[in-house]
Amino acid sequence: MGLGKSVVIEKQRMNGDLRMVKKRKQHRAMASRHIVLLSCFVFLAAQHGIQAVEYEVTNNAGSSAGGVRFTNEIGIPYSRQTLVSATDFIWGVFQQNTPEERKTVQKVSLIIENMDGVAYASNNEIHVNANYIGSYSGDVKSEFTGVLYHEMTHIWQWNGNGQTPGGLIEGIADYVRLKANYAPSHWVQPGQGNRWDQGYDVTARFLDYCNSLRNGFVAELNKKMRSGYSADFFVELLGKTVDQLWTDYKAKYGN
């Protein structure tokens, strides 16, 4: 082999070695960046109390009028995003900033199907009546969104280990819907209703009044209901019995 040829081969070998060294440095730099990013994610997760929840949406209504309208005017992607948004909003209303303050829920399923009623939540599943979607006159997407906020509240709220009155449970769910600005026009106006625990929109309006007396009242009430329920919670938080508060509420609005 000639001297010139040997020099060329040696230069090629050296250039190859240099390229390998450069690639190793690049890989080390990328690995370092990944470690930094992972560390940042872990830090942020610890700071903000990230809780991983899986959301699943299924349309079992097929080619029925409600199933078709759901597909055309609402859709699975929007429904899934609404479940996520509703969860974040509910945690905010309940002032639950860490996973320790919340229910442990790994998966929430939304099922669109033909059934009776409007919707219900059970065992971390939300069932919505496709017939209701199909026959609703008006902005069905807004109505559907409000229903999801109500039902998602049932997934996340505390119920006093089954001791909380049903009217209060439903009232808190509608209170969340009210604060999310998805209250429909047919709801009662403030001050209307016969009993504080009448439920739904009546109790939601009353809770809104109570929350105006003490900002964060509903969040504190929900926290107290983690392990049980007592009507004394109203006295502890607002200094009056719930019946006194109801009387004051009715008087404020001339009812």
Language-model-detected regions and their locations in the chain:
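N-terminal low-structure segments adjacent to metalloprotease catalytic domains
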Residues: G2-N72, N255
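Pan-zinc metallopeptidase signature
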Residues: A31-L37, F43-T58, D197-A204, Y209-N255
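Auxiliary, metal-adjacent structural segments of Zn-dependent hydrolase domains
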Residues: V53, A61-N131
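Second-shell loop/turn segments in exported
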Residues: R69-R80, N131-E143, W158-T164, Q192-R195
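Stable alpha-helical elements in mature extracytoplasmic
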Residues: S79-A86, I90, V140, F144, ...
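Post-HExxH zinc-binding segment in Zn-dependent metallohydrolases
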Residues: A86, N97, G162-R205
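Sec-exported extracytoplasmic/periplasmic mature domains
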Residues: W91-P99, T153-G162, D174-Y182, D208-N215, ...
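Active-site scaffold of zinc-dependent metalloenzymes
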Residues: S109-N159
